[in-house]
A protein has these predicted regions:
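Nucleic-acid endo/exonuclease domains
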Residues: 1-114
Length: 114
């Protein structure tokens, strides 16, 4: 048991001979939040990223999962930065692995802008 209160409740249930499971299941849940893309050009959403921390990467994956038909592309300030000091994965590698077209801010493809 992780908490003293949990131990107390378990003791009570045990003393009453109530069958139970302690943390026996994992339940999923969704927190409804809004995502505001940086730019929309036609039907394409452009998200700009300088520093790209784990919570932002999780958010982008969640946005893509919730909106699989949207065309979301990422413009990186430094696409070859590693996602963390110990990783070999760069921002651009992460984008490719997760199905996001990407480019560097200084090399935005012209066809993205039409």
């Amino acid at each position: 048991m992780r908490r003293h209160l949990e131990e107390q409740v378990a003791d009570l249930l045990d003393s009453m001979k109530v069958p139970y499971q302690y943390e026996g299941e994992k339940l999923t849940y969704t927190i409804e939040v809004k995502y505001i893309p940086d730019f929309k050009v036609g039907d394409v959403y452009l998200e700009t990223k300088g520093y790209f921390p784990p919570e932002q990467r999780r958010k982008m994956k969640a946005v893509k999962a919730a909106n699989p038909d949207l065309d979301i592309r990422i413009i990186f300030q430094s696409p070859h930065n590693k996602i963390n000091k110990r990783s070999k994965t760069t921002y651009s590698m992460w984008a490719e692995k997760n199905g996001f077209p990407w480019c560097a801010y200084y090399a935005i493809p012209v066809d993205w802008l039409r």
